[in-house]
Regions:
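Hydrophobic core
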Residues: 9-17
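Lumenal/extracellular ectodomains and adaptor appendage modules
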Residues: 23-470, 482
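Bacterial N-terminal signal peptides that target proteins for export
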Residues: 1-8
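C-terminal membrane-anchoring or membrane-association module
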Residues: 475-485
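Hydrophobic membrane-targeting alpha-helices
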Residues: 16-21, 480-481
Length: 485
């Protein structure tokens, strides 16, 4: 939900920037913060849109006067120069917020009205041309744009003690659909109250125009419980429509392969090899390669090992030896991170049976908040090479599922005492969370179990490395991703 609301939170910023200016941190007021927000969207056939947003501060007047005074109180500047300076700073901040939310804009303007013309309110007017404001999903065969009557308050963090001032916020959204569009869904009327706080939504359709309004009244010191009561059950955040011609989709395709090879030695030590193979998106793969070169291969491998060894040690694994290699840095194609270890305590031992648990879905469900924002193809290959005399007790059952083109397969093969488990998860771009849950929801852990010949076992293995396939191999990649962020 937080990812889903990134754009809504960006729209909230136009008001938030003003709230922060009107109410300094820790300030209190007996008068509520009053605001009116107006947003008008003119959608084109390709999903691009002209957007107009107006945000008016209506009170308290004393705070507005202080806010205006701070803007105009600039050394060696006329009032006009001071306003232009503030507008430029605010415009830069707002463009950055929209970009971070995933919305690309051009031809942006921002004007601050009512500062010194004798009016009793201040209004910000922001205009821009937004690319792909509405997105087409072939998965659902309709266009979709976010419209959040809560203005992001449904997911914004709130102090346990609440805010030291009340708020009265009026929101109006006017959405002009493309010509020949057929409206499918839009925010419906809603009413919720909690003590003296209220949240109302009203909506209507006039021709090809959708009009949604909301009123939000928040009492001072309203805590998280109150916000939850007001907003948690509201779930219609979209305008959806079809057009005679389907739209074009633009999205990334992620292809990652992960391998774990565990060779159980006669001494009950385990030779562990892990590989993570990045195939797509090619732009990200190239970035990873460039980052490693900048960091230095030796430094990069050391950092990967340090993180992996730290994780394994925290799980009770005894590491006797460790090394890392990086392949594909100077070639077109995949980037491969490989680590090798000699370890003890790799599996959990229960009544003489060795158990290895892992998540065959690679946590694919965790990366989806509402819709899949990219096409994903993940493959996991696990091999257990058991010594002579070992007996296989339990293996993962075969899985072959298809939900609306999303696929999840798991296959186990045994040759001599070598176990190979291969799982694959393919998620379509735009796949709905409900469908992915149907595909993966009841599979989060499977097990390989085996016994070793008498005298070959170890009393050391008492810790379970739960889901190591989704943890140890990912650490090296996570390191790079975090650095990028």
């Amino acid at each position: 939900m937080k990812k889903l609301m990134a754009l809504a939170l960006a729209f909230l910023m136009l008001g938030t920037l003003l709230v922060g200016s009107v109410y300094a941190a820790g300030s209190k007021s007996s008068e509520p913060y009053k605001e009116e927000f107006y947003m008008e969207v003119f959608l084109s056939d390709n999903g691009d849109a002209k957007i107009i947003m107006k945000n008016s501060l209506l009170g308290p007047q004393s705070r507005i006067d202080e806010f205006v005074s701070r803007i105009l109180n600039q050394t060696n500047m006329t009032n006009e120069q001071a306003i232009k300076k503030y507008e430029a700073q605010l415009l830069g901040n707002y463009i950055a917020q929209l970009k971070n939310s995933g919305l690309e804009t051009t031809n942006q303007t921002l004007h601050l009205l009512g500062v010194y013309n004798g009016t009793h309110n201040v209004t910000l007017v922001f205009t821009a041309y937004a690319k792909s404001f509405a997105k087409y999903y072939s998965y659902s065969k309709y266009w979709e744009m976010i419209l959040d009557p809560t203005r992001g308050l449904a997911t914004s963090p709130v102090p346990d003690s609440g805010l030291p001032y009340g708020s009265e916020i009026r929101n109006i959204f006017v959405i002009h659909l493309p010509q020949d569009a057929k409206l499918l869904e839009y925010p419906k009327p809603y009413t919720m109250e909690f003590n003296h706080s209220k949240f109302y939504v009203r909506s209507e359709v006039k021709g090809n125009t959708v009009i949604v309004s909301s009123d939000i009244i928040l009492e001072a010191y309203l805590g998280p419980e109150g916000y939850k009561a007001l907003f948690s059950k509201y779930d219609t955040f979209y305008v959806r429509y079809t057009t005679p011609k389907p739209g074009k989709e633009q999205y990334k395709t992620s292809v990652v392969m992960q391998e774990i090879i565990a060779k159980v030695l006669d001494s009950t030590d385990t030779e562990l090899t892990t590989r993570q193979i990045f195939v797509k998106p090619e732009q990200d793969v190239d970035y990873f390669k460039a980052y490693i070169k900048m960091l230095g291969v030796k430094n990069a491998t050391n950092m990967i090992l340090q993180n992996n060894v730290k994780y394994l040690s925290s799980q009770g694994v005894v590491i006797k030896n460790a090394s890392a290699q990086i392949y594909g840095l100077n070639d077109k194609g995949p980037l491969i991170l490989e680590t090798r270890y000699l370890v003890q305590n790799f599996t959990k031992v229960v009544n003489g049976t060795y158990e290895y648990s892992f998540d065959p879905t690679l946590g694919a469900l965790n990366g989806i908040s509402y819709r899949a924002k990219e096409e994903t193809n993940q493959t996991l290959k696990i091999q257990f090479l058991l010594p002579k005399g070992a007996k296989i007790v339990k293996l993962p059952e075969e899985i072959n599922r298809d939900v609306n083109g999303n696929r999840f397969t798991l296959k186990t093969t045994v040759k001599d005492n070598n176990i190979t488990v291969i799982s694959n998860v393919y998620i379509r771009y735009g796949a709905l969370l409900d469908d992915v849950q149907k595909l993966l929801g009841n599979v989060s852990k499977v097990q390989i179990e085996y016994t070793l010949p008498e005298g070959k076992g170890s009393a050391l293995g008492t810790k379970e490395i739960a889901g190591i396939a989704g943890a140890i191999v990912l650490i090296g990649a996570t390191l790079l991703i975090l650095k990028r962020r």
